[in-house]
UniProtKB/Swiss-Prot annotation, chain B:
Its cofactor is pyridoxal 5'-phosphate. It is an enzyme of class 4 (lyase). The beta subunit is responsible for the synthesis of L-tryptophan from indole and L-serine. The modification N6-(pyridoxal phosphate)lysine is found at residue 92. Coiled coil: none annotated. Pathway: Amino-acid biosynthesis; L-tryptophan biosynthesis; L-tryptophan from chorismate: step 5/5. InterPro entries: Trp_synth_b_CS, Trp_synth_beta, Trp_synth_beta/beta-like, TrpB-like_PALP, TrpB-like_PALP_sf. The keyword Ribosomal protein does not apply. The gene is trpB. Tetramer of two alpha and two beta chains. It comes from Nitrosomonas eutropha (strain DSM 101675 / C91 / Nm57). This is Tryptophan synthase beta chain. PROSITE patterns: TRP_SYNTHASE_BETA. PANTHER family: TRYPTOPHAN SYNTHASE, TRYPTOPHAN SYNTHASE-RELATED.
Amino acid sequence: MNRIESVFSRLKSQDKAALIPFITAGDPDSATTVALMHQLTRSGVDLIELGVPFSDPMADGPTIQRSSERALKHHISLKDVLAMVAQFRKMNQSTPVVLMGYANPIEAMGYKRFVEEASRSGVDGVLVVDYPPEESAEWVRHLKDQGIDPIFLLSPTTPESRVKHVAELAKGYVYYVSLKGVTGASHLDLQDVSSKLSQLRAHIRIPIGVGFGIRDEQTARSIAERADAVVIGSRIVEEIEHSQAADLLANVGALVESLRHAIDARSNHSSDIG
Amino acid sequence: MKMYDLPDKRGHFGPYGGTFVAETLISALDELCKQYEYYRGDAEFQTEFFRELKHYVGRPSPIYHARRWSDHLGGAQILLKREDLNHTGAHKINNTVGQALLARRMGKSRIIAETGAGQHGVASATVAARYGMECVVYMGSEDVKRQATNVYRMKLLGATVIPVDSGSRTLKDALNEAMRDWVTNVGNTYYIIGTVAGPHPYPMMVRDFQAVIGNEARQQMQEEYGRQPDALIACVGGGSNAIGLFYPYIGEENVRMIGVEAAGKGIDTQKHAATLVTGRPGVLHGNRTYLIQDENGQIIETHSISAGLDYPGVGPEHAWLKDCGRAEYVAITDGEALAAFHALCRFEGIMPALESSHALAYAAKLAPTLRKDQLLLVNLSGRGDKDMATVAQQSGISL
């Protein structure tokens, strides 16, 4: 069982939803990222999505775009991100790390070299925003060769035929984008999320995480009542942006603890995965 | 050469093109593919498109023999395909008319566009006014400054211009922002991409609408000169005017096709936009193509005196035509383009856009190496009125 499976299987036995934060590697600087990852695990997260900064983050809103720009000021490269994961792994063997980013830094490194180095660094999954399943056959083969899970996005507009296609390719978990638009937007319809998740579960046999538009404890709890994992990105990145260096770990830690508390307080959990 | 039938069903030109977008955009693109597939074969749609090109755009655009300039250069004869005479002053309108007609049939009431030089923005605002649609144009704030006149033109036409302050504040950032708008408002919104880049079906669809340039040229050359030109020359930013001219000629292998990119301050400096000449393949803005990028795959800011060529990618069909050797790609500096701008003004009484001046500058280099009976057909893709301030500034004059 790999790290991602272990985490979800433990959570299932505890009847809990996973808390997945997103941070951009190198934001605000490379020295902070590994410390921040350890802080996140201490504050109770189950898996970390680590953003690979890119110059043109088309699917992200202004908050995450700015975090990318901050990281790129320090010239953080994909190689640097992998080094951060390796550094994190020296102290932490159990928390899965999923890289999330855009295709071109991986294209520049080459599939083969990337998956080998990612595997060596202790990366557990990779989500490439602009590799939809149609363009992913070779990419997924390379990932699976190295035992890395290909994570895919599903959206409110994904038709059933594509859900089936994603179900065949995806491993680890799938990431349901709970609203139309970019990261950091805010108009989440819980009714929609519930009905869409039950449709997805007809085909998807692995855990389903929900992200985009989750900005407060109450929404996090409501999502936790419906999904297997709650992904929180822009809200955490905002906390990083607005914190002074000296308070950054404490501020993010406090925010994450409150979210953890909220999602563990969920009721009526009706997940029927596995 | 075997029959050229690219792209494939998923929009691939060899290894290039495709649909490299986030899941949230896929269903909108699928819908667009389906609708365009239907209407490209629909006689009534095509009839309306060509009627609009004739009566609204003013097509066909003539081929003009630049005789005095050719004599001065002392070699091949330079012929100009006069896209600058189109309504709104550039080739861009061929495409926006086509896409606006499609948007109407798809029941969309709002169109959005990205623009660099402002020509595509003006062409989009124009058709939005013509067909009674709401129009929002995204433009890098740097370009807003460089192209103040075009910004005002768009506003006069009723469009809302939104300056984009992220990244390098140029065309690529405007494109990112337009994609974001589309993802958010896909229900009532149609995204008019202005060039042959982006995810499938845009590179194919924009090419098809712009192919009127090459199709007319083939007929006009036959009628007026009794033969086809020895070479086609067109500037390449994203590459829509070049593909429009080249595409109908791909099967005619004795016609050379030359795409001219912006060498800016020189391709050995960091300040250029010569994507095919200096770049490496990668993925950006929905397609795999050549990109100007650093060794880590980050996109590098480009530079050109002409905002319309200032883009770090290029249409995937050009990437393919380069790799298979059917087309050649070269680069022209800011200075060479300016010299060609002035030459055309003085020798022919035609003020070319700075974008088109790159193609003219290469023609001026090539012509003297050829015989006097050889013919170079240059796509004069736009007129230069919009560039007046830039040209004056280069001469130390403030208007």
